[in-house]
UniProtKB/Swiss-Prot annotation:
Catalyzes the initial step of the lipid cycle reactions in the biosynthesis of the cell wall peptidoglycan: transfers peptidoglycan precursor phospho-MurNAc-pentapeptide from UDP-MurNAc-pentapeptide onto the lipid carrier undecaprenyl phosphate, yielding undecaprenyl-pyrophosphoryl-MurNAc-pentapeptide, known as lipid I. It comes from Paenarthrobacter aurescens (strain TC1). It is found in: Cell membrane. Pathway: Cell wall biogenesis; peptidoglycan biosynthesis. It is a multi-pass membrane protein. This is Phospho-N-acetylmuramoyl-pentapeptide-transferase. Its main location: membrane. The chain crosses the membrane at residues 2-22, 55-75, 86-106, 120-140, 163-183, 196-216, 239-259, 266-286, 291-311, 348-368. The keyword Transcription does not apply. It is an enzyme of class 2 (transferase). GO terms for biological process: cell division; cell wall organization; peptidoglycan biosynthetic process; regulation of cell shape.
């Protein structure tokens, strides 16, 4: 628990102090956001706002994670140190963040709202996702537990939903596809949510807060733990290190949100939204709560569905629309809601989804007592 407090504290300070310094750098370089003309007219005033703020969030997470482990080692040389699960999560977060950084950099360099083309972006994301999926099936600990398994999970692995039903090779291939589906859904969900000042950051703080709570609980109720109660123990590798990273991410985003809240002094850009989405997907896979992500990240799911419905209905109906504009948050803007009103109400929705996810997580454990 001390590690979580240290990590969160360092992340908060790095983000709070680092973000305004990064804003000054971006302003000096004239690196600002370009706003699409077909968006809400109220957004045109945001043109030129510094972007790529996700760079600070990623840096704060990396610094905090390794500084925390260094401090814990100095306090106790026998401490575990960085875990395989923690490093793999950082790999996916940084990898996706790098793809987003390339996209943002092309936008600001060419002074337009379009960055990487869709094919290049998809290929890069798939490459990072495939490497991650292959690696998480490796690195067994002393108990033979690996960061992930081929079994699809809800709040724990579901034995009768094993992707390795056709053998190890088939299982590995299907797991790579399944993992990339989760990664693509999470990254696109956060990316689509990042359209209003503070919306994605605030919602993500709650999501990572949930993973902090679940990681602590999984550690306390790990199979073989002295605190294990009943038959509901968890077989998750490195749950406490995952809880540490979740706490660090929440704190880093709190520090960033101080500057990103309306009126935003900086946007997270694709650098931030893809990095956060990658981290969300990694938590779902590594904590063995893949299907539960539909509840924990319910706001991201809702906003993604609004885009799918809008595009699908537009094509099938020959040009008609369900919403005034998609993603969903812009529909309410065009209905006359103030941006801050939309953001706060969507934060409330995000909190309700997170509460539902945590309720399902805990209720399953109670049933197994």
């Amino acid at each position: 628990m001390i590690a979580l407090l240290i990590g969160a504290g360092v992340a908060l300070l790095v983000a709070l102090i680092g973000t305004p310094l990064f804003i000054r750098f971006l302003v000096a370089k004239s690196y600002g956001q370009f706003i699409r003309d077909d968006g809400p007219t109220s957004h045109h005033t945001k043109r030129g706002t510094p972007t790529m703020g996700g760079t600070v969030v990623v840096a704060a997470v990396l610094i905090s994670y390794f500084v925390t482990h260094l401090i814990m080692w100095m306090m106790n040389p026998d401490s575990a140190g960085p875990s395989a699960s923690g490093l793999l999560l950082l790999f996916l977060m940084v990898g996706m963040g790098f793809v987003g950084f390339l996209d943002d950099f092309i936008k600001i360099s060419n002074k337009r709202s379009l960055g990487l083309n869709a094919r290049a972006k998809l290929i890069l994301q798939a490459a990072v996702g495939i490497i991650f999926a292959v690696l998480v099936l490796q690195f067994p600990n002393e108990d033979g537990l690996r960061p992930a398994s081929t079994q699809i999970s809800l709040v724990r692995d579901i034995p009768w939903l094993d992707l390795a039903f056709g053998g190890t090779v088939v299982g590995a291939i299907l797991f790579v596809l399944w993992s990339n589906l989760i990664i693509t859904a999470a990254t696109n969900g956060v990316n689509l949510t990042d359209g209003l000042d503070g919306l994605a950051a605030g919602a993500s703080i709650m999501v990572f807060g949930a993973y902090t709570i679940m990681g602590i609980w999984q550690n306390n109720q790990a199979c073989g733990s002295p605190r294990e109660a009943g038959s509901g123990c968890y077989q998750v590798r490195d749950p406490m290190d995952l809880a540490l990273l979740a706490a660090i991410l929440s704190a880093a985003l709190v520090g960033f949100l101080w500057w990103n809240t309306s009126p935003a002094k900086i946007f997270m850009g694709d650098t931030g939204s893809l990095a956060i989405g990658g981290a969300v997907a990694a938590f779902a896979i590594l904590s063995r709560t893949e299907l539960l992500l539909a509840f924990i990240g319910g706001l991201f799911v809702l906003i993604t569905l609004s885009v799918i419905i809008q595009v699908g209905f537009f094509k099938l109906s020959g040009g008609k629309r369900v919403f005034k504009m998609a993603p969903l948050q812009h529909h309410f803007e065009l209905k006359g809601w103030d941006e801050v009103t939309v953001v706060v109400r969507f934060w409330i929705l995000a909190g309700l989804f997170v509460a539902a996810g945590l309720g399902i997580f805990y209720a399953e454990w109670v049933v197994l007592l």
